């Protein structure tokens, strides 16, 4: 599984969706980056291939970062790369 994690402005936790194939993850990454670079905000509707009932709609001008990372069986239960310290801070509060 490949995870696409979006960091949103004013939100401490990322929004994540997964893709089964690397090509699908790369295509979604490019779609998100293109939307972020656009002059006009647009709604991005994302679905998840791991949890097929999971859907999220996000305004492109609210995305501050996109991280693509491959998950193996052991890592998928762990923390998202780049967000581990943030998760620890939130859990302590």
Swiss-Prot record:
InterPro entries: UPF0367 (IPR020885). Belongs to the UPF0367 family. It comes from the Bacteria. This is UPF0367 protein ssl1972.
